[in-house]
UniProtKB/Swiss-Prot annotation:
Source organism: Stutzerimonas chloritidismutans (Pseudomonas chloritidismutans)
Protein name per Swiss-Prot or TrEMBL: Chlorate reductase subunit beta
Principal location: cytoplasm
Activity-pH dependence: Optimum pH is 7.5.
Alphabetic keyword roster: 3Fe-4S, 4Fe-4S, Cytoplasm, Electron transport, Iron, Iron-sulfur, Metal-binding, Transport
Protein's UniProt keywords contain Isomerase: no
Length: 24
């Protein structure tokens, strides 16, 4: 579902943001 995908995307964003130090 869209909700599930959105949750996954947000989780990925959090992981990437933590690695780069910057989150958009």
């Amino acid at each position: 579902t869209v909700k599930x995908q959105l949750s996954m995307v947000l989780d990925l964003n959090k992981e990437i943001g933590g690695q780069t130090x910057t989150a958009a």
